[in-house]
């Protein structure tokens, strides 16, 4: 089996995490997984949604979108259609669920964190890149809240979160699929994990033939290997 990119089966794409990418947001990152590029920002606003009023905890929510020409052909803006598509809603809910697992909301205070992930170029794995990059932007936003005199109850960051795709490509498990691989893969799996080694989400779909238990185990092992590298990249980015 030869991957279109020439990478080894267990090799991530070239990954870059650029912090403080935009001027105004409390946390901002440009994350690049190969040719997939996503701007991730975290904005801090006082107050929480109505369903959390008086409960003494904060909240985090996420939105996701793609520029019209992030892909090979122009896509109509969802705003011009008047509604978000099902894929967009699914991905932004995944991002929100994943990042909430990083936080102790009771220590966040009366604050809402708005995570925005905007894909400026797509070449596969936009949701996993979004989660991995937004986690770094979230860590930076928490530092800003602390500098402003917040977080009196302690650090709400429990653990780091990252995500990566794995799949069965030409009968073999591979890590971090690009678009060419993703579009031809027999199985596509998105995995979200904590830096402590726990799984937050595993999304898997077979195309054509079902995948077998031993293939699932092989893909998860590959994802865990990739996560080790991603968490190290996040730590290195935050140490700069």
UniProtKB/Swiss-Prot annotation:
It is an enzyme of class 2 (transferase). InterPro entries: ExoRNase_PH_dom1, ExoRNase_PH_dom2, ExoRNase_PH_dom2_sf, PNPase/RNase_PH_dom_sf, Ribosomal_Su5_D2-typ_SF, RNase_PH, RNase_PH_bac-type, RNase_PH_CS. One of its GO terms (molecular function) is 3'-5'-RNA exonuclease activity. Phosphate binds at residues 87, 125-127. It comes from the Bacteria. Pfam families: RNase_PH, RNase_PH_C. Its EC number is 2.7.7.56. GO terms for biological process: rRNA catabolic process; rRNA processing; tRNA processing. Keywords: Nucleotidyltransferase, RNA-binding, rRNA processing, Transferase, tRNA processing, tRNA-binding. It catalyses: tRNA(n+1) + phosphate = tRNA(n) + a ribonucleoside 5'-diphosphate. The keyword DNA damage does not apply. Disulfide bonds: none annotated. HAMAP family: RNase_PH. Belongs to the RNase PH family. Phosphorolytic 3'-5' exoribonuclease that plays an important role in tRNA 3'-end maturation. Removes nucleotide residues following the 3'-CCA terminus of tRNAs; can also add nucleotides to the ends of RNA molecules by using nucleoside diphosphates as substrates, but this may not be physiologically important. Probably plays a role in initiation of 16S rRNA degradation (leading to ribosome degradation) during starvation. Homohexameric ring arranged as a trimer of dimers. This is Ribonuclease PH. It comes from Pseudomonas syringae pv. tomato (strain ATCC BAA-871 / DC3000). The gene is rph.
